[in-house]
UniProtKB/Swiss-Prot annotation:
Entry GO MF terms: adenosylcobinamide-GDP ribazoletransferase activity; cobalamin 5'-phosphate synthase activity
Topology term for the membrane: Multi-pass membrane protein
Organism: Saccharolobus islandicus (strain M.16.4 / Kamchatka #3) (Sulfolobus islandicus)
Location of the protein in the cell: Cell membrane
Reaction catalysis annotation: alpha-ribazole + adenosylcob(III)inamide-GDP = adenosylcob(III)alamin + GMP + H(+); alpha-ribazole 5'-phosphate + adenosylcob(III)inamide-GDP = adenosylcob(III)alamin 5'-phosphate + GMP + H(+)
The protein's name: Adenosylcobinamide-GDP ribazoletransferase
Major subcellular site: membrane
Parts forming coiled coils: none
Cited HAMAP family: CobS
């Protein structure tokens, strides 16, 4: 595994200032490990920031964390969410929807989907609270959301207009099983249901657009993160390997 390709994942998926001259093909080749490397790294940073903010702002720390979450991601996935929202609002043939997906202007559909995301995200972050489990909620949610975005790219053929989608699909189409195995320590019984339902919805959306794309993957990562986080908080990560390890740690020390 080349270090250059791994480090390039940080510059591609986040705003963390790591210089890399890796090509898009090299980034796509190693992207299957990004849920573990990038997802866990982001969760650790978010957890550290949240702990510091919570000491000052208490419950309101979640609102500030919203900005931190998007800032760490460089707002890249948020752009995909806005584009997908515009495409979903278009009535008519596929060409018009693709035009809206690739258009740089933001329409009412993009704003609407953004409001949906912000509503769920704010509720999830306000409910985060402060406990031993907080870091594990964030780790699980980051890993799961990144995985579902990449899993969509690996299992659904890209639209002809998406160069990024083609590159990632070619590099990931043999890695879908690996992506699912990476989930095992982090996914609970309840999040399996969320994962499957979310994937089926996105699969239907991809069919209406003619395939997957980088924008669709980015939108999936963005929108699924608060859903997984909220599920983790409500269920306390029950029936997951992480929850078992947490239980053993708390009761054996």
């Amino acid at each position: 595994m080349r270090l250059k390709g791994v480090l390039a994942l940080f510059s591609f998926f986040t705003a963390i200032p790591i210089k890399s001259n890796a090509s898009l093909e090299e980034i796509a080749e190693y992207s299957y490990i990004s849920p573990l490397i990038i997802g866990i790294s982001l969760a650790l940073i978010e957890s550290a920031v949240y702990v510091l903010l919570y000491r000052i702002l208490e419950a309101l720390a979640g609102i500030v964390l919203l900005g931190v979450v998007e800032l760490l991601r460089g707002f890249n996935h948020l752009d995909g969410l806005l584009d997908l929202g515009d495409a979903l609002m278009i009535k008519g043939d596929r060409e018009r929807k693709i035009k809206a997906l690739k258009d740089v202007e933001i329409g009412s559909g993009g704003i609407g989907l953004l409001l949906v995301y912000l509503s769920i995200q704010i509720v999830a972050l306000l409910k985060l609270g402060f406990s031993f489990y907080t870091i594990f909620y964030l780790i699980s949610s980051n890993v799961l959301s990144m995985t579902i975005g990449l899993y969509i790219l690996s299992t659904i053929s890209p639209i002809p207009e998406s160069n990024l989608g083609k590159i990632f699909h070619n590099k990931l189409k043999g890695k879908s099983t690996v992506l699912l195995f990476e989930l095992i320590p982090f996914i609970s019984l309840y999040n399996i249901i969320v994962f499957l339902v979310f994937y089926m919805i996105m699969h239907k959306i991809c069919r209406s657009l003619g395939g997957s794309s980088g924008d669709i993957a980015g939108a999936s990562i963005t929108l699924s993160f608060p859903l997984f986080l909220l599920t983790n908080e409500i269920t306390n990560l029950n029936y997951s390997l992480l929850s078992i390890l947490c239980y053993l740690f708390l009761h054996l020390h």
